[in-house]
Amino acid sequence: MKHIRTRFAPSPTGYLHIGGVRTALFSWLFARQNNGAFILRIEDTDVARSTQASVDAILEGLRWLQIDWNEGPYYQSQRMDRYREVIEQLVKSDDAYRCYCSKERLIKLRNTQLKNKQKPRYDGFCRDKAPRQSNEPFVIRFRNPVEGAVVFDDLIRGTISIDNRELDDLIIARSDGGPTYNLTVVVDDWDMKITHVIRGDDHINNTPRQINILHALGAELPHYGHVPMILGPDGKRLSKRHGAVSVLQYRDEGYLPEALMNYLIRLGWAHGDQEIFSREEMVQLFDISAVSRSPAAFNPEKLLWLNQHYLKTVSPTIIAEAFATQLEKAGTDLRNGPSLEQVIALQAERTKTLKEMAQRSLYFYQEVRSYDEKAARKHLLATIVEPLQRVRERLASLPSWEKEAIHEVIVETAQLHQLKLGQLAQPIRVALTGDTVSPPIDATLYLIGRDSALKRLDHAIRFIHQGMG
């Protein structure tokens, strides 16, 4: 069997969004399950719009998702001499020709065709004319066959046939000599021995054109697979308001790479009713031919559900570094406070993203200087001073700082003062966290630590006394 070689070829003219990542994932999975190679290529011939920042973001996004590549990144901007060489080869073999048509003529031609309800296309005006000896500007067009059809078996869509009469003579070199997209892609796939081109279905109209150029070069054709687009929940093309943002924004919002990978593989592909896939299962089970031909709808709630699943199931050690980043972004000093792994284990059931987890965990690492106004009015009352004082004294005298012992102190104090457990736990929670939401109060006290907990209880008692005065 021929050695499988796939590629991902983004343009660095913007961010790497989830549609591009899904295409990269499918291509990467196909290579991995066939013991093949996954090649990364940066299509940066659009010098005006390509930026190094975009290149860096693409590489960083792929690394975050652990979509690793065997070769590259190759840069088209470094291969210009090779493209010119192939263009010259096509001209010499009479598979390409100079076109001197002015912009005005082409605009007039297009308007006439539209007026006559015809498909806008080049009419071949320069196709059979000899090259001029003047210094007039020209482009180079590929001499597309006028008979027959381009037929190929798409890995996802099955057999596709395009009549050559539907295709005009596309430009392969601009008037400044620069190669166009359809030429560079063909040369790269040929030179890099790509066996399977898996890409978005927005490229499907380019495929017959590229196949004809490959035929003219005497090159072996790769297999093609065109992945349907991702739509928003409203059925419209995915936009920023739906979630078509940089993949790194998902990282910054506290999503886990495992969750995003799992979500994207299920967008348009299924394996029975299975929802959760490990990376190993993805490689083993993914089937490119089983990808749906219909567009997939992006569901942010499903992604959140998956993210929470992974927060609960991934080892806290694995996500501790990302959690630390979120806490530091929130302005927290991590030198004081419990271990990150302990907080993750405690908060994973209660939060859906690492960012939310960090926002809800700040009180573990910084003193509480103020209270939510509504929470303080409801729970930090004069009637609770004595029970709080009792809790403070009992906690201070515990021989060891253990959750079970802490729990006993709260239960016994509530019974002593004829309070329901919640009537005592909520004021303690407000004193410790500044608000009414936290994990179980014994676990919260345990992680905050004895010294800090006692200080916070003292602060709350003073706060109540000041209010009484």
UniProtKB/Swiss-Prot annotation:
Its EC number is 6.1.1.17. One of its GO terms (molecular function) is zinc ion binding. Keywords: Aminoacyl-tRNA synthetase, ATP-binding, Cytoplasm, Ligase, Metal-binding, Nucleotide-binding, Protein biosynthesis, Zinc. GO terms for cellular component: cytosol. It is found in: Cytoplasm. A motif ('KMSKS' region) lies at residues 237-241. Its main location: cytoplasm. GO terms for biological process: glutamyl-tRNA aminoacylation. The keyword Transmembrane does not apply. Zn(2+) binds at C99, C101, C126, D128. InterPro entries: aa-tRNA-synth_I_cd-bd (IPR045462), aa-tRNA-synth_I_codon-bd_sub2 (IPR020751), aa-tRNA-synth_I_CS (IPR001412), aa_tRNA-synth_I_cd-bd_sf (IPR008925), Glu-tRNA-ligase_bac/mito (IPR004527), Glu/Gln-tRNA-synth (IPR000924), Glu/Gln-tRNA-synth_Ib_cat-dom (IPR020058), GluQ/Sye (IPR049940). It catalyses: tRNA(Glu) + L-glutamate + ATP = L-glutamyl-tRNA(Glu) + AMP + diphosphate. It holds the Pfam family tRNA-synt_1c. Its cofactor is Zn(2+). Disulfide bonds: none annotated. A motif ('HIGH' region) lies at residues 10-20. Monomer. Catalyzes the attachment of glutamate to tRNA(Glu) in a two-step reaction: glutamate is first activated by ATP to form Glu-AMP and then transferred to the acceptor end of tRNA(Glu). Belongs to the class-I aminoacyl-tRNA synthetase family. Glutamate--tRNA ligase type 1 subfamily. This is Glutamate--tRNA ligase 1. It comes from Coxiella burnetii (strain RSA 331 / Henzerling II).
